[in-house]
Amino acid sequence: MATTKPYRVLLYYMYTTIENPEEFAAEHLAFCNSLELKGRILVAKEGINGTCSGTVEQTEKYMEAMNNDPRFDGIVFKIDEADGHAFKKMHVRPRPELVTLRLEDDINPHEITGKYLEPKDFYEAMKQEDTVIIDARNDYEFDLGHFKGAIKPDIESFRELPDWIRENKEVLEGKKILTYCTGGIRCEKFSGWLVREGYEDVSQLHGGIVTYGKDPEVQGELWDGQCYVFDERIAVPVNQKEHVIVGKDHFTGEPCERYVNCSNPECNKKILCSEENEAKYLRACSHECRVSPRNRYVIQHELTEEQVAAALEKIEAGK
């Protein structure tokens, strides 16, 4: 018999009207703290976007309170079991937008958005000809895992996506467009923007990758790698039938699914690397970052100037 883990991680969003995001954020933070939840929740006039962790009892109380608030009627929680908290602290922050597109004329998903496809329909659509699959996430998310045949827009943040589409419109013209993201919130706006731009056949994965991976029928099939998540777990599995590693070590190109942040705080780039290469390259993505006086790996491990010089010499020699 399957054992239930003592903690849960909740992932959810809802486009709805919140009149005073600042006031709501302060009250919601106090409520979350009273339940001893930990997580990161963004609040805007257009709605709420959150992920938080707690015990089964704590998360049940939270979901009950949210469901009893008329503003969040119909909200859907994606639930993962966990052995402990997925966050260190609890943050609830007001924001101008739930997802940052910074369009002059913003998209309201209640007014315009792409067609919703449930996992089975999305699975079937991916196999059709004349279909283009666009990953609406950032480059480092794609590098860890993605749907087979998906296009990787060369972007570092979501707000760069519209410009990338305009520069590569020949890839999409006359095609059926499928979009997907982690939980669905980015695609609500992105697919709506595509429709407004004049693309006629635009669909989005309802509930995102997380829902697709839990679907009992598709079982995450056609997904390679893992799904990047914005908590201490970093990655979660999607494909229940086979696990194909697509991530590549930043330094050697070998298969890798272990993310670290570059040790130079002014860079902080997410890089895939093994524990061995983390030590060898001082957890820095480049020579410039390795020699940074603020290199966190050097400080954390209390390395002397001689030890750093020896490490740099070894890298230079290709050893």
UniProtKB/Swiss-Prot annotation:
EC number of the protein: 1.14.-.-
InterPro entries: Rhodanese-like_dom, Rhodanese-like_dom_sf, Rhodanese_C, TrhO, TRHO_N
Active-site feature positions: 181
GO biological process, one term: tRNA modification
Domain Rhodanese: 127-221
Listed GO MF terms: oxidoreductase activity, acting on paired donors, with incorporation or reduction of molecular oxygen
Keywords noted in UniProt: Oxidoreductase, tRNA processing
Keyword Ribosomal protein carried by entry: no
Pfam families: Rhodanese, Rhodanese_C, UPF0176_N
Major enzyme class: oxidoreductase
Catalysed reactions, as listed in the record: uridine(34) in tRNA + AH2 + O2 = 5-hydroxyuridine(34) in tRNA + A + H2O
Keyword tRNA processing carried by entry: yes
CDD domains the UniProt entry points to: RHOD_YceA (cd01518)
PANTHER family in the record: RHODANESE-LIKE DOMAIN-CONTAINING PROTEIN 7-RELATED, THIOSULFATE SULFURTRANSFERASE/RHODANESE-LIKE DOMAIN-CONTAINING PROTEIN 2
Family, as annotated: Belongs to the TrhO family.
Function comment: Catalyzes oxygen-dependent 5-hydroxyuridine (ho5U) modification at position 34 in tRNAs.
Protein name (database record): tRNA uridine(34) hydroxylase
Organism: Bacillus cereus (strain AH187)
